[in-house]
C-alpha cells in the first residue's frame, strides 16, 4: 500500500501548515504529515513553507530577518484565528495524537543550527529519543546537511530522506549512504518530483540501485488521477499529496507495483493522446527546469523579480508544481 503523506498537512482544503490543517490531515488518516521548518533571527524554529510571509500571512516579513516577537503577531489571511506555529507546538500536538508521524522539510535557506535546535526541541517536548525516531522523518536538500547531521549525531537512527528536484543530487545522497555503510545513518529514501519518475534516468538507472539497497521513493506533489496511475505502476513507497482523502481513494483504485516486472510494467502514454502530450511535454519541462534552476544567473533579480521566480509562477500555473 502506498504511504499517503499530507503535503503541508492538508493544503488542498485548509490553510497550509496551520493547526487546522494538521487536525484535518490526522482525521483524514494521512500516514504521515509533511511540514516545513524555518528559523527566525532570534532562533525560534517555526512552521512555514516560504522564507517570507506575504503569501500566507497578513504582513510580509522575511522570517530569517525577523524576531519571533514580530512573527507571532501575524495572522492567516484566509482565517484570522490562525497564527504561525512553532516547531515545539506541532511536536506537542504530535505527542497528543497517537500514531501521528511527521516529515520535516528543513529548508536549506536556514543555518544548519536549525537541525540541532530541532533535535533539542524534540527532547524538550518528550524526553524519549526512541519515540521521535519512530515518528519523525528528516527531509534534507543538500549533501553537506546530511554530513552535518552525521557529524553531530542528530540523525542517528532517524529516517532521513533527500528532497530534490534533481535526480543527480538524490544520487549523491544515495552514494554517500552506500559509501558510509553505517546502519545508524542509512538513507531511508528519496523524495523527488513526480515527473522525474517518468524519466529513463530514474526508471533504468537510479531505481534498480534504490531497490537493491532498500531505499524508498516518495513523489511530490501528486494530485491528478492520471499521475496516481503512473505512480502505482512503479514501486513507489509514498505519495506526497495536497489532499490525503482523495489520494487514498485514487491509490486504492490501482494495483501497486512491488517491483518492476514483465506483468506490471510502466508504460508511457502515446503522443497521440492528451495524456501523452502532457506526459512528454512535462518531461521536457522537467529536463529544462533542472538545467536552469541550478544555474546561478537565473537567481539574479531584475526589478525585484528573478527568472527563477518567474519560472516558478509559470510552473504553478500549468500545475507542474
Curated annotation (Swiss-Prot):
Q: Which GO terms describe its cellular component?
A: lipid droplet; mitochondrial membrane; mitochondrion
Q: Give the UniProt subcellular location, in the record's own words.
A: Mitochondrion membrane; Lipid droplet
What is a biological process (GO) this protein takes part in?
glycerophospholipid catabolic process
- GO molecular function terms listed in the Swiss-Prot or TrEMBL record: phosphatidylglycerol phospholipase C activity
- Pinpoint the GP-PDE domain residues: 2-251
Topology term for the membrane:
Single-pass type IV membrane protein
Q: Does the keyword Cell membrane apply?
A: no
| Chain's role | Phosphatidylglycerol phospholipase required for the removal of excess phosphatidylglycerol (PG) via a phospholipase C-type degradation mechanism.
Question: In its UniProt entry, what is this protein called?
Answer: Phosphatidylglycerol phospholipase C
- Organism, per UniProt? Saccharomyces cerevisiae (strain ATCC 204508 / S288c) (Baker's yeast)
Amino acid at each position: 500500500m502506498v504511504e499517503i503523506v499530507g503535503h503541508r498537512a492538508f493544503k488542498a482544503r485548509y490553510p497550509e501548515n496551520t493547526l487546522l490543517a494538521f487536525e484535518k490531515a490526522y482525521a483524514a488518516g494521512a500516514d504521515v504529515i509533511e511540514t516545513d521548518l524555518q528559523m527566525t533571527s532570534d532562533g525560534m524554529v517555526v512552521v512555514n513553507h516560504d522564507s517570507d510571509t506575504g503569501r500566507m500571512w497578513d504582513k510580509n516579513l522575511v522570517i530569517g530577518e525577523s524576531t519571533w516577537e514580530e512573527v507571532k503577531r501575524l495572522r492567516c489571511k484566509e482565517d484570522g484565528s490562525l497564527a504561525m506555529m512553532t516547531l515545539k507546538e506541532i511536536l506537542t500536538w504530535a505527542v497528543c495524537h497517537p500514531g501521528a508521524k511527521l516529515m520535516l522539510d528543513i529548508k536549506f535557506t536556514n543555518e544548519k543550527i536549525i537541525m540541532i535546535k530541532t533535535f533539542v526541541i524534540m527532547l524538550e517536548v518528550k524526553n524519549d529519543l526512541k519515540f521521535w525516531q519512530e515518528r519523525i522523518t528528516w527531509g534534507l536538500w543538500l549533501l553537506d546537511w546530511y554530513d552535518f547531521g552525521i557529524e553531530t549525531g542528530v540523525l542517528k537512527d532517524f529516517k532521513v530522506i533527500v528532497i530534490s528536484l534533481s535526480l543527480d543530487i538524490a544520487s549523491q545522497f544515495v552514494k554517500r549512504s552506500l559509501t558510509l555503510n553505517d546502519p545508524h545513518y542509512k538513507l531511508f529514501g528519496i523524495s523527488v518530483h513526480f515527473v522525474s519518475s517518468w524519466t529513463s534516468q530514474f526508471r533504468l538507472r537510479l531505481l534498480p540501485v534504490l531497490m537493491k539497497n532498500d531505499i524508498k521513493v516518495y513523489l511530490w506533489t501528486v494530485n491528478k488521477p492520471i499521475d496516481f496511475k503512473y505512480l502505482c505502476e512503479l514501486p513507489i513507497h509514498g505519495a506526497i499529496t495536497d489532499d490525503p482523502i482523495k489520494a487514498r481513494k485514487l491509490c486504492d483504485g490501482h494495483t501497486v507495483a512491488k517491483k518492476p516486472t514483465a506483468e506490471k510494467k510502466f508504460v508511457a502514454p502515446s503522443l497521440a493522446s492528451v495524456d501523452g502530450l502532457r506526459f512528454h511535454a512535462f518531461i521536457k519541462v522537467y529536463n529544462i527546469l533542472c538545467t536552469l534552476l541550478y544555474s546561478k544567473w537565473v537567481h539574479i533579480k531584475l526589478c525585484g523579480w528573478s527568472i527563477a521566480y518567474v519560472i516558478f509562477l509559470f510552473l504553478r500555473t500549468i500545475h507542474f508544481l
